[in-house]
Amino acid sequence: MKDPIRKLDEPRSSVATKPLRRVVAALILRGEGPSREIFICQRRAGQPMGLKWEFPGGKIEPNETSEEALARELEEELAIHATIGPLITTIRHTYRNGGAIEIEFFLVRDFQGEPVNRIFQQMLWSPFSALPDYDFLSADLTLIRDLADGKLL
């Protein structure tokens, strides 16, 4: 006999429900006006979603605030000491594999040191208008459009 009819809002048993992962990311800016740029990073080829572009950041550890997590991640990934600015936006995204992520994006205008590439394939400063030219993670695509269109920052 076939399985009983399943309501559409009930999860399929074959798709594992994964816990929501909370992460933080930095929108690091330099310059002013039309010449301002934003810092972006490309994942290494061997990583999950390899060679996709993203903003630097990472997971929030237990007992850590979002701002503490972002400052720690920027030190670990880029060797910079950043002053974490205001929260710009929060995005929730569910990937095709069932993984769900909540990303808090913070503005960073002030930091000490020059970014050092500790974990990425490549890193660069991009004009806002060029952001759609890069192959970003799907969770970032709405933000990328808003930044390129001048709707944020």
For the regions a protein language model found, what residue spans apply to each?
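Conserved N-terminal beta-strand and adjoining loop/helix that marks the start
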Residues: 3-39, 59
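NUDIX/MutT-family hydrolases
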Residues: 107-109, 115-147
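Generic C-terminal helix-cap and adjacent flexible tail
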Residues: 148-153
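Short secondary-structure boundary/capping segments
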Residues: 18, 45-46, 95-98, 114-117
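Active-site-adjacent beta-strand/loop module that shapes the phosphate/pyrophosphate-binding cleft
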Residues: 81-82, 89-114, 122-124
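Conserved Nudix-box catalytic region and its N-terminal flanking loop in Nudix hydrolases
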Residues: 35-77
